[in-house]
């Protein structure tokens, strides 16, 4: 299966800062995708606010697009089951190349979040930091590889149903002596997606293969 896909784009950025207290970076990108023959506009922004000398707030938001490669991204699912697109199986009466070409593989999502970092002293002044991060990715169009739709098929389709990922993370870093860093992190992920059912209904499920809890020391 051969296809050609090229993108060309322009990016513009504006930075505003108030000495070492506050900074704002606003950017916008425009891309042309040859496969879909469409233009995509993706704005984004970042802020950094030093609330005090030892307390910093960061926040960001951005819209993003991703052109998925259905076969490469899901090669592990090719275990004897047919690949089907919006209900049409590629090894039936429908040509695989036609189905693949006509399928909308462009995902669209908005990511919003930020972090709060506090520097403090344990053994000596300012030798440790504690930060809390939260980010949410909200999908407005997502390509789903549904393994539960049918026992004999992996069904690919676009869903505009409720699909999101919430990530919470806490990081601790301590340098008690020179060249010795102690680092610990804990992350909680709540990821959910909407699946279509053969009866025409929809169901909200936890995203597969995503670890809810992660910790590192």
For the regions a language model picked out, list residue spans one by one.
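Short sequence motifs at beta-strands and strand-loop junctions characteristic
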Residues: 2-6, 18, 37-39, 67, ...
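Transmembrane beta-strands of outer-membrane beta-barrel pores
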Residues: 6-8, 28-34, 61-67, 76, ...
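Outer-membrane beta-barrel translocator domains and adjoining extracellular loop/strand segments
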Residues: 1, 36-43, 70-76, 83-87, ...
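Membrane-embedded beta-barrel scaffold of Gram-negative outer-membrane proteins
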Residues: 50, 58, 90-158, 164, ...
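Surface-exposed extracellular loop regions of Gram-negative outer-membrane beta-barrel proteins
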Residues: 2-48, 174, 178-190
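Residue-level detector of the transmembrane beta-barrel scaffold of outer-membrane proteins
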Residues: 11, 23-25, 48, 56-58, ...
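Gram-negative outer-membrane beta-barrel transporters
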Residues: 17-20, 129-139, 156-217
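Extracytoplasmic loops and strand-loop junctions of Gram-negative outer membrane beta-barrel proteins
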Residues: 1, 25-30, 81-101, 150-157, ...
């Amino acid at each position: 299966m051969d296809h050609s896909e090229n993108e060309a784009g322009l990016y513009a950025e504006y930075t505003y800062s108030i000495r070492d207290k506050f900074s704002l970076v606003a950017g916008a990108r425009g891309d042309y995708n040859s496969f879909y023959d469409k233009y995509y506009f993706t704005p984004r922004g970042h802020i950094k606010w030093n609330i005090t000398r030892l307390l910093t707030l960061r926040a960001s938001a951005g819209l993003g697009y991703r052109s998925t490669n259905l076969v490469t991204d899901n090669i592990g699912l090719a275990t004897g089951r047919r690949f089907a697109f919006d209900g049409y199986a590629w090894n039936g009466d429908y040509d695989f190349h036609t189905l693949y070409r006509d399928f909308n593989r462009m995902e669209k999502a908005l990511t919003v979040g930020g972090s709060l970092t506090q520097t403090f002293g344990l053994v000596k002044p300012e030798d440790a930091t504690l930060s809390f991060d939260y980010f949410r990715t909200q999908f407005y169009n997502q390509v789903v590889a549904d393994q539960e739709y049918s026992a004999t098929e992996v069904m690919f389709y676009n869903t505009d149903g409720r699909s999101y990922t919430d990530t919470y993370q806490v990081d601790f870093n301590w340098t008690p002596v020179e060249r010795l860093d102690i680092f610990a992190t804990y992350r909680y992920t709540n990821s959910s997606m909407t699946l279509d059912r053969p009866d025409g209904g929809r169901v909200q499920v936890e995203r597969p293969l995503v670890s809810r809890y992660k910790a590192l020391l």
